């Protein structure tokens, strides 16, 4: 479940609000006209707190929201969902490139037609 209220993107707030050692997905953004505006979607497959504390955009975007997940697969799937939701609704994100599968895992995006076509092509190639 995503946090209902955006948090300030500062090291003190991140350390207080984000539990160390848990994977998760996050959105960096800003408040415009009283609403949170998505600007960057990302994830950590191992420790969301560390990812946010060391993020290149730590001081560029003033707010973040996040959700914990159980593992790297779920982090990839939720990041992909949020990324596709933004693109499908005309939201321009800073990160235009589709989320990558976690290291050493060949996961396919469940929301992406390209990913589905690639999976089918690989399956057909292996079967022949």
What role is predicted for each listed range?
Residues 1-38, 43-128:
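Boundary/linker segments flanking structured domains
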